[in-house]
Amino acid sequence: MVPPVQVSPLIKLGRYSALVLGMAYGAKRYSYLKPRAEEERRVAAEEKKRLDELKRIERELAEGDTILK
């Protein structure tokens, strides 16, 4: 088996710094996007509720038309 390679402390520092910066960026981006996604879900739920109500009314009208004929 090949022995582990010695890595420069400067390279290790750079790698861990990039990791920490990426985690910080991800946390900041997530906190920015989360409220927007919640708003989109809320609007979509309201739209779905409105469409379901329209479909229900349309279905009731269609059933009412068949009874009268």
UniProtKB/Swiss-Prot annotation:
Protein's UniProt keywords contain Acetylation: yes
Cellular location(s): Mitochondrion; Mitochondrion inner membrane
Keywords: Acetylation, ATP synthesis, CF(0), Hydrogen ion transport, Ion transport, Membrane, Mitochondrion, Mitochondrion inner membrane, Transport
Keyword Lipoprotein among UniProt keywords: no
Family to which the UniProt record says this protein belongs: Belongs to the ATPase e subunit family.
Induction: By UV light.
Official protein name in the record: ATP synthase F(0) complex subunit e, mitochondrial
InterPro entries recorded: ATP_synth_F0_esu_mt (IPR008386)
Record PTM N6-acetyllysine, positions in chain: K34
GO MF annotation, one: proton transmembrane transporter activity
Organism field: Cricetulus longicaudatus
A single GO BP: proton motive force-driven ATP synthesis
Cellular component, GO, one term: mitochondrial inner membrane
Gene (name only): ATP5ME
Superkingdom, taxonomy of origin: Eukaryota
Subunit structure: Component of the ATP synthase complex composed at least of ATP5F1A/subunit alpha, ATP5F1B/subunit beta, ATP5MC1/subunit c (homooctomer), MT-ATP6/subunit a, MT-ATP8/subunit 8, ATP5ME/subunit e, ATP5MF/subunit f, ATP5MG/subunit g, ATP5MK/subunit k, ATP5MJ/subunit j, ATP5F1C/subunit gamma, ATP5F1D/subunit delta, ATP5F1E/subunit epsilon, ATP5PF/subunit F6, ATP5PB/subunit b, ATP5PD/subunit d, ATP5PO/subunit OSCP.
Major subcellular location class: mitochondrion
Function: Subunit e, of the mitochondrial membrane ATP synthase complex (F(1)F(0) ATP synthase or Complex V) that produces ATP from ADP in the presence of a proton gradient across the membrane which is generated by electron transport complexes of the respiratory chain. ATP synthase complex consist of a soluble F(1) head domain - the catalytic core - and a membrane F(1) domain - the membrane proton channel. These two domains are linked by a central stalk rotating inside the F(1) region and a stationary peripheral stalk.
